[in-house]
Curated annotation (Swiss-Prot):
A GO CC annotation given for this chain: glycine cleavage complex
Record lineage: Archaea, Thermoproteota, Thermoprotei, Sulfolobales, Sulfolobaceae
InterPro entries, per database record: 2-oxoA_DH_lipoyl-BS (IPR003016), Biotin_lipoyl (IPR000089), GCV_H (IPR002930), GCV_H/Fam206 (IPR033753), GCV_H_sub (IPR017453), Single_hybrid_motif (IPR011053)
Record protein name field: Probable glycine cleavage system H protein 1
Organism field: Sulfolobus acidocaldarius (strain ATCC 33909 / DSM 639 / JCM 8929 / NBRC 15157 / NCIMB 11770)
Family annotation (PANTHER family): GLYCINE CLEAVAGE SYSTEM H PROTEIN, GLYCINE CLEAVAGE SYSTEM H PROTEIN-RELATED
Amino acid sequence: MSVVIDGKYLILKDRHYTETDEWILINGNIATVGITDYAQKKLKDIVGIELPQVGREVTIGEQVAVVESVKAAADIFSPLSGSVLEVNKELQSSPETINKDPYGRGWIFKLKIKDEKEVSKLLNFEQYIISIKQREGI
């Protein structure tokens, strides 16, 4: 299930979100992380990415990756504490995949969650919709 905000921003109901526009899909103690449709549309044409190193221990809110577009570079933050299990190597040669499929093939990294209690700090889809509406003045 999904929701479209203001006729342009797709939000999936099965994800968690952050105020910094990362989405998180949790399966057991594994979190798959990417940037939202809202974020990729704000960045426009994505041309590069710096991925985190597999095995890296990260804490909630830590900068872990950078997405580069023709317009700007955007830091990607870890939504939870844990260790990086996998990165989407396809993005190194095809970073535009994030623009084409931000919630699917455009995922950025997978994280083994260290503290499942941190999940409660994430936004649900309704809270994320409110966040976007406030920023966009809609």
